[in-house]
Amino acid sequence: MKTDLPPQKVEEVSMESRPLIAITMGDPSGIGPEIIAKALLRQEIWEICRPIVVGDLPTMERAIELLGTGQRTRPLRSLLETREVGEVPILQATAEDLRDSSWGQVDPRGGRAQVEFIKVAVDLALEGKVRAMVTAPINKVGLRLAGVSFPGHTEMLAHLTGAKRFAMMLAGEKLRVVPVTIHCSLKEAIESLSEDGIWEKGLLTHDALRSWFRVERPKLAVCGLNPHAGDGGLFGDEEQRIIEPAIERLRKEGIDAEGPMVPDAVFRMAAQGRYQAVLAMYHDQGLIPIKLLEMEKAVNLTLGLPIIRTSVDHGTAYDIAGKGIASEESLVQAIKLACKLAQR
């Protein structure tokens, strides 16, 4: 869905010290609307950016009423409109009628709407109208009901921006993790693990650490796939066949990569500062440790895109949606990181 907003030059945005940041609502039936409302109550957010919610006005008003915060919604006619704490500036980005949708229940209309929110925000970022986009969680069943074949945000964003190489990083205060395979079954993750995939994710991680996180000489830890990193081939040969050759290729590129590391020990070492990032071989191998250590502090960051995109480190939380108890902390951290990266 295209917006009717007039063209805006990047120079017009850069004259304002606080960057314009698009925040997508995510699944309208999940906790996205309420955590956005809570985040926009915080003075610290308004001090670092000019937020724009890309979503649905009636849904946002419903979330504000639920929370009882008394915030005012401001339907935007121009991205340059002034706004202030206590307001929720919103760009209506769907024609779906969501007024009778229910919290915590998958709805095909919400599935379609969450896709429209993403597309509008991507267009704004690609056109230079916003400096970054921050995404609230989407529902993957809703994606399927909307006829979208992508398994998650990361893959959809890569498609919409034309990125050929991309990766998902979870970044916290103590730990940064990049899974080589992401949204697929464990069986498929093992079958699809490749030397090229590890090498590619290693390059993206190294580049992000240098350019975005200002780490001059980053050191990467590369996990093994099997228990004890295969223990010399006793528990599988993927380490010798796939992982070790990928590490050698990274080293030839001048990247300080170490491994294959024993998975049950490497995350503690990285959290203590020995490594600046860990390459995990599959989704849960990497995300369980960082969520255990830094839940609500970690931020999902997509590497390899021509735009800046950050996100929360959690899902739609249908079990608590509509109860007003969801924490906005991960979203706040995602907004802060997006602002920091937008100014580099």
Predicted regions and their residues:
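Short, flexible loop segments at boundaries between secondary-structure elements
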Residues: L160-L175, L305-Y318
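Glycine/threonine-rich beta-strand-loop-alpha-helix active-site module
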Residues: L145-A167
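Ligand-binding beta-strand-loop-alpha-helix segment within the catalytic cores
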Residues: L170-W199
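A generic local secondary-structure boundary/capping motif
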Residues: L79, L157-A158, F166-M169, S211-W212
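Contiguous, glycine/small-aliphatic-enriched amphipathic segments in soluble metabolic enzymes
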Residues: K2-H153, S192, D196-M281, Q285-T310, ...
